[in-house]
Amino acid sequence: MINRLVALLVGIVLVAALGACTPSEAVEVTAKFDDVGDLAKDAPVLMADIQVGQVTDIRLADARAVVDMAIDPQAEVPADVVARVRRTSVLGERIIDLVVPEGVPLSSEPLADGAEISDT
């Protein structure tokens, strides 16, 4: 009985570990901001309040914050999105929110690997 329980627990841990891995086929994109506040590496990237990726790096270049993100290719985020830094609540963590500007038709093309989100 104990052997079965141990085997079950090991199986659950392996499945969880494999599911938590960042897929190597993630779409890597970049956005530049004047200010990101206390945005942290590994912060979620959301679209329509659904997580579609995560922040992989934050660095300074030309007096602006450059944020690298890994986006799930299955999310098919349109190429014309705008990236905004916002809080999840008044005291909550900062996240990246991807939105399509009002009045702008959705692009038929998803974000390409290496793309820069130009409007932030």
Spans of model-derived segments:
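Non-cytosolic, membrane-proximal linker/loop modules
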Residues: I58-T120
